Amino acid sequence: MRTAMRKLLLSSLITVTAISGIPAVAHTPYQQIRFADTSLEAGAVSCAQLTQLRQPDLRIERATSVAANSTWDLASLMTTRVEPGFCRVEGSIEGTIDFEVWLPLKEDWNGRMLGTGNGGFAGTILTNGLAHGVQRGFATSSTNTGHHDWEQNWAVGNTRAQENYAHRAQHLTAVNAK
């Protein structure tokens, strides 16, 4: 029964993305974001100030400075030490797409961004990809693709959840992370 449901779900997702003519995601251009006397563009904003960011459909839940050489639990399988310090940003887009962005300190940043995946039907943010990226100097993002792994029927009859999983969540996370 589970195999049949998975095949049906996969078939539905492929059909939705392949033949439905889903339009490209419309998106409002961002304005320069200012915090008191500093701006993000100047690189002078503290990690904690990122919670003040206001954009349509974007909510920053937490922005936490993480000390260098911190130990992280990687998907409950193992732990690793993340050598550089970084800013851990946790938030949501449109209320259902959870994401994290790990921002290296200015002196450690290579000037590039890395969006990580999570495999399978997703539903969780895997910190191993985030740790891997930030240790190499990338501003690194990950998303749960719009649902939680404990939700068994997240896509049944929910076209928006299927679209988020298929492509929107990755796109919106990348756009907002930048």
Regions found by a protein language model. Give the residues of each.
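Bacterial N-terminal signal peptides that target proteins for export
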Residues: 2-12
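Cap/lid segment of the alpha/beta-hydrolase catalytic domain
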Residues: 110, 119-178
